[in-house]
C-alpha cells in the first residue's frame, strides 16, 4: 500500500508519539552510559509500507453500539488495514467466530458473528484491489465492569473471557496474561489517576512507582496508551510516560506507546490510530511490531493540561519516510 503525503522530515512534534523519542531524557541523567536502541532499525524504508490500525475496538458484544459486522465494515470502509476487536470480557477468536457475551454487561444483546463470506472479502480485500484488513485475533479488554476503569487490553491471549475485574488493579490482569503467554497494554491510565483533572498526579511518586513496577516485572506488558479517543482523559498521560521512561529504561526495557479510538459508536471511529511499518500486512508481522515498536502512535486530537485550547487536526497525518 502506497500512501500519499509522506514527509521526509523529523520534527519534535512528530517524534512525540514515536516509541523511542524520550530515551534522550534518560540519557541526560548523571554520568551513566546508555545504549539508545532505535526500534526502526529493522525497517527497510524503500520497500516496507505503512498500514493503518486500530487496536482498541468495541461492539454489541460488550458496551459498543454497533454489531461486530457493522463495526468491522466501518473501519474497512475508512481504509484501515489492521483491526483488533477488544470487547470487555470477551475474547475475539475471529470476527466470523461465535463469542460468549456476559449477560447484563452487554444488555443481553445478541452478538452475531460476521458471515464467512464477508470475512473472506474483507481479509483478502477482494473488493479493495486486494488490500485486505487483517483480523488481530485473541484480543480482549480485561478488568470488566470496574468503576475505576483500570482497563487492560490483552492480545494473543486465551485469558480473560468472562473474568470480572478488580477495582484499582492493573497488575492482576497483566500477570495473568503473562502466564498465558500473551501481551498486554495499559489503557487510558489517566482515567484511574484522574490526571486530566489533577495533572500534577502524573509526576507523583505513588503513580510512577505503581506503573513502573508493572513494566519492570512484566516484559509482556508492552506499553500504554498515551492517547485514547479525543485525548480527554489521557491529556496528562504523556507526562506520566516520560516519568516512567526515566525509571524503567535504566532497567533495560522500553515502554512502547499506543493511540487508539476505544470505539463504541460511529462517531468514535478515526480519531486515534497507529501506523505500522511492515514488509507485509500479516498478523505475525503486527505481533512482532507491537513488541519492537516499529510503528507510530497518531491522533487527530491533542488536549493540554494548562487550559490552552486543544488541537483537532484535519486531513491525513504526516508520515515519516526515513530515520537516519
Place the predicted regions along the sequence by residue.
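A metal-dependent hydrolase metal-coordination microenvironment
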Residues: 32-198, 225-241, 260-263
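Structural recognition of alpha->loop->beta junctions
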Residues: 202-232, 278-285
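Histidine/acidic residue-rich metal-binding segments in metalloenzymes
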Residues: 168-180, 206-219, 235-252
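Sec-dependent signal peptide cleavage junction
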Residues: 17-32
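Short low-complexity, flexible loop/linker segments enriched in glycine and/or proline
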Residues: 97-102, 199-204, 208, 272-274
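Short loop/turn motifs at secondary-structure junctions
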Residues: 2, 79, 219-220
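C-terminal functional module detector
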Residues: 29-33, 37-45, 71, 248-256, ...
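Sec-dependent N-terminal signal peptides
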Residues: 4-19
Amino acid at each position: 500500500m502506497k500512501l500519499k503525503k509522506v514527509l521526509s522530515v523529523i520534527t519534535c512534534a512528530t517524534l512525540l508519539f514515536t516509541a523511542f523519542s524520550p530515551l534522550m531524557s534518560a540519557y541526560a541523567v548523571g554520568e551513566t552510559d546508555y545504549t539508545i536502541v532505535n526500534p526502526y532499525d529493522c525497517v527497510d524504508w524503500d520497500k516496507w509500507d505503512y498500514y493503518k490500525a486500530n487496536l482498541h475496538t468495541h461492539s454489541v458484544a460488550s458496551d459498543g453500539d454497533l454489531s461486530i459486522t457493522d463495526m468491522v465494515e466501518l473501519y474497512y470502509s475508512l481504509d484501515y488495514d489492521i483491526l483488533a476487536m477488544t470487547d470487555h470480557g470477551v475474547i475475539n477468536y475471529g470476527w466470523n467466530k461465535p463469542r460468549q457475551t456476559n449477560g447484563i454487561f452487554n444488555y443481553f444483546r445478541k452478538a452475531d458473528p460476521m458471515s464467512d463470506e464477508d470475512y473472506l472479502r474483507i481479509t483478502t480485500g477482494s473488493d479493495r484491489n486486494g488490500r485486505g484488513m487483517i483480523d488481530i485475533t485473541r484480543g480482549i479488554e480485561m478488568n470488566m465492569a470496574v468503576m475505576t476503569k483500570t482497563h487492560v487490553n490483552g492480545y494473543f491471549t486465551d485469558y480473560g473471557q468472562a473474568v470480572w475485574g478488580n477495582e484499582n488493579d492493573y497488575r492482576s490482569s497483566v500477570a495473568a496474561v503473562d502466564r498465558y503467554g500473551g501481551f498486554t497494554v495499559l489503557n487510558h491510565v489517566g482515567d484511574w489517576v484522574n490526571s486530566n483533572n489533577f495533572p500534577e498526579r502524573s509526576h507523583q511518586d505513588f503513580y510512577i512507582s505503581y506503573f513502573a513496577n508493572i513494566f519492570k516485572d512484566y516484559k509482556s506488558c508492552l506499553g500504554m496508551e498515551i492517547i485514547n479517543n479525543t485525548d480527554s482523559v489521557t491529556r496528562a498521560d504523556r507526562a506520566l510516560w516520560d516519568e516512567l521512561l526515566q525509571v524503567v529504561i535504566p532497567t533495560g526495557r522500553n515502554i512502547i506507546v499506543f493511540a487508539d479510538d476505544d470505539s463504541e459508536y460511529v462517531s468514535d471511529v478515526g480519531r486515534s490510530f497507529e501506523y505500522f511499518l511492515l514488509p507485509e500486512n500479516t498478523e505475525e508481522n503486527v505481533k512482532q511490531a507491537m513488541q519492537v515498536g516499529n510503528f507510530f502512535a497518531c491522533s487527530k486530537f491533542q488536549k493540554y493540561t494548562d487550559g490552552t485550547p486543544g488541537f483537532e487536526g484535519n486531513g491525513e497525518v504526516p508520515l515519516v519516510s526515513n530515520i537516519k
